[in-house]
Structures are given as C-alpha cells and as structure tokens.
Amino acid sequence: MLDPNMLRNELDAVAEKLARRGFKLDVEVLRQQEERRKVLQVETESLQAERNSRSKQIGAAKARGEDIEPLRLEVNALGEKLDAAKAELDKLQNEIRDLALSIPNLPDDSVPVGKNENDNIEVSRWGEPRKYDFDVKDHVSLGEMAGGLDFAAAVKLTGARFVVMKGQIARMHRALSQFMLDLHTEKHGYLEAYVPYLVNHATLYGTGQLPKFGEDLFHTKPLAEESDNSNYALIPTAEVPLTNLVRDEILEEDSLPLKLTAHTPCFRSEAGSYGRDTRGLIRMHQFDKVEMVQITRPEDSMAALEELTGHAEKVLQLLELPYRKVLLCTGDMGFGSSKTYDLEVWLPAQDTYREISSCSNMWDFQARRMQARYRNKTDRKTRLVHTLNGSGLAVGRTLVAVLENYQQADGRIQVPDVLRPYMGGLEYIG
C-alpha cells in the first residue's frame, strides 16, 4: 500500500511512476475523493463542535431554570446531521482505501522500463550448459523411468497439475529441501520457522494477495464451522505467513535485520495459465518451496536484496546448475515489488533458462498494510520496516533441473555431491 500522503501531495509524480509499469492511475477520481474528504472532515468537526457547544448551553439553561426543550431539539437535529456526515465520511474513506489497495507498488528508479519479460535485462550468467553425446530426455521421462513420478496416480487422487513421487525421486525431493534449509540456517543466518499452511484474510491483505488476487488462491470453508474465522486460504508461498509474523508489531532496531526461512507446500490455482506447461512439474497446483524473508531498516533494504538474491544463487552454485540472473522490467514485476531479480536455471530438454527463484524488495508496501514498524534507537520514534522475500529455491523446479542436468546416457541420474550426505551416500538413482 502506498503512502497516503504521497497520494495526496505528490499525485502527479506517483501517476508517472505507476505509468512506467503500465498502470493508469485515475488522478481525477483521487483528487475528487480527496477534496470531498476534506469537505466532510471539516463538516463533521464543525457539527461536533456546534453540538458540544449547544449541549453545554442546555446545562447552563437548566441551572437557570429556563425551558431547555428548544435547545434539546436543536442538539438532536445536530446529532442526526453529524451521524449522517460521519457515515458519508466513513463510506468515502473506505472507497479511498479500497482504491489505494488496488494500486501496485512504485518501481525503484534502478528498474528498467518495459512492457513484459522481453524487456527484462540479463545481469549475469553462472556455469556452462553441459554438452550431451546422447538424446536428452525431459524430467517426466526420466522420473517415470526411475519409477518415481506418477502423474496418473495424482489424477486419480485429485486431478491435473498434481504429482505422486515415490522411492528415490521422493527421497531426492526431500534431500533438496533439507539441503536448502541447512544452507540458509547454518551459513546464511536465517531462523527456520514452521508456519500454518492455512491463513486468514487479514494475513493475505498484509502481504498483498487480497483483495486483488483472490482468484489465484485456494479458499476453504469447513462445513462444520460456520464463522468468520473459518474463512481460510491455503498459502501460495511461505512469504505470506513469514512476513505477517511482524504484522502489528514494533521491533527494536537492534533486532534488525530479521531473517526467516521455511519449507512449505505452496498452493496456487494458476488462474489464467490454462494450457501453459501442462507436462511435468513446472506449473503445479501444489509444490514445495524453501522461502527466505528479510525484515530490514529502510536504508538497508537494497543491500539486503543483493544479499538475499546471492543466497538463492548459492544453492544453484553448490548444486552446480547453470543459471542466469535477470533484472525484471517495470511491466514484469509483481504487484507489491519495488525491484525484483529472477534466477533462471538451465533446462536441457527445453534448451532454455526457466525461472526457479524470484527475489524482491517490497520496500514499505507490505509494512504499511501490516503496520509493521521498528523503534529507532536514537530518537525512539517508530518507522515502517522494509520487507523482502525470495525463493531459496522452488524445490520441484530444482528437482527438474537436477534430473535433466545430471542425466546419464543409460537414463540414470547422478546425485550432486552436496546431496549425497542427505541420500545415504547414493551416487546414482534410477
């Protein structure tokens, strides 16, 4: 959520920045709403003051033994006008808030202006894609040959875009998540958290999934519990519960940065992606991810973005998977992001790089929604924190990359060196 003071006092500058990311801000509507809000604010304050004055006059008249009925009727009439003005002001303020919640974050000045992924800028590459002297198989064929990926069973159990993993493939999937968590907690300084996979609507508003992206979520309403508290949604990413841990909190400055990580399943309806990536593990309704979140002081957040992205890169480097780092343009960034790097891993069967991590600085956009603040240790004033998040990594897509990049001519998969301690020393699977 953008700073309301910016929307009031720097509207043209805000509109220009939003236009860079293809968002047209209706400046005239906002101006009209703000003018009407000021009028109603003055009107309610004036009516309140007048009613208070008349109420005092009633007391004085009563003490003098005068007839107070005319004054009482006047106070009642003022009260009705005040209630009507307050109701109109509340309605208008809700409309202003709803509009503010629909406005995306402002892009940082370092973000390239563009319309879509074609305008993203490649920052760097790491590793060289391997040359094969045999026909490369995709991860679906390799997983099925190993008896470890069963999409038909998942269709029977649930439906499309789900998978059942078995045996050595399931073990490698588990090994990847354990390796990632150990790296982030032991080497990168993150605190591991176990979080709920179901969250309430306040949590989803806090990180920006609601109200705009409700159709992307799986919503639940238990039949046995008819109450407001039973309107939960499955998390689309651990960013949601991890970041909301600081909602309505005031942190001490010395506790920052706060670095959190969690391994969770993630659930997405994939609305609007019909027909895309229908084969395999690339785009699933349920997938595992190790998420990283940082809560920082405003002046530290851009450096934290570089650090957090580097932590995701380290996973790929230790797995020896070729990848490239891409700076997203204004038209390709997520709703709440001020600046985003994507990491794209090389997939031999597709002969291209595919996204495996997205690392974003959300600036104070989420913090304002959550009222997440810290207390400055010098002046003891409270300020909004900055929030950052990144995949470290998407476990299923990392499994895809390992299967394809480490495949052998006979269909076996070589186990990356860093995973062998998690797999009982196995050198090959399949």
From Swiss-Prot:
Q: Which Gene3D superfamilies match?
A: Bira Bifunctional Protein, Domain 2, Serine-tRNA synthetase, tRNA binding domain
Positions that bind ATP: R268, S269, E270, E355, I356, S357, S358
Compartments annotated for it: namely: Cytoplasm
Q: Which reaction does it catalyse?
A: tRNA(Ser) + L-serine + ATP = L-seryl-tRNA(Ser) + AMP + diphosphate + H(+); tRNA(Sec) + L-serine + ATP = L-seryl-tRNA(Sec) + AMP + diphosphate + H(+)
Q: What is its main location?
A: cytoplasm
Which Enzyme Commission number(s) are on file for it? 6.1.1.11
The record's listing under InterPro entries reads:
aa-tRNA-synt_IIb (IPR002314), aa-tRNA-synth_II (IPR006195), aa-tRNA-synth_II/BPL/LPL (IPR045864), Ser-tRNA-ligase_type_1 (IPR002317), Ser-tRNA-synth_1_N (IPR015866), SerRS_1_N_sf (IPR042103), SerRS_core (IPR033729), tRNA-bd_arm (IPR010978)
Q: Which GO terms describe its biological process?
A: selenocysteine biosynthetic process; seryl-tRNA aminoacylation
The cross-references to SUPFAM superfamilies, in alphabetical order and at most eight, read:
Class II aaRS and biotin synthetases, tRNA-binding arm
Primary enzyme class: ligase
Query: Keywords, A to Z?
Result: Aminoacyl-tRNA synthetase, ATP-binding, Cytoplasm, Ligase, Nucleotide-binding, Protein biosynthesis
GO cellular component term, pick one? cytoplasm
* GO MF annotation, one: serine-tRNA ligase activity
Q: Tell me, how does this one assemble?
A: Homodimer. The tRNA molecule binds across the dimer.
Q: What is known of its domains?
A: Consists of two distinct domains, a catalytic core and a N-terminal extension that is involved in tRNA binding.
Q: What does this protein do?
A: Catalyzes the attachment of serine to tRNA(Ser). Is also able to aminoacylate tRNA(Sec) with serine, to form the misacylated tRNA L-seryl-tRNA(Sec), which will be further converted into selenocysteinyl-tRNA(Sec).
Q: State what protein this is by name.
A: Serine--tRNA ligase
Q: From the UniProt record, report the name of the gene that encodes this protein.
A: serS
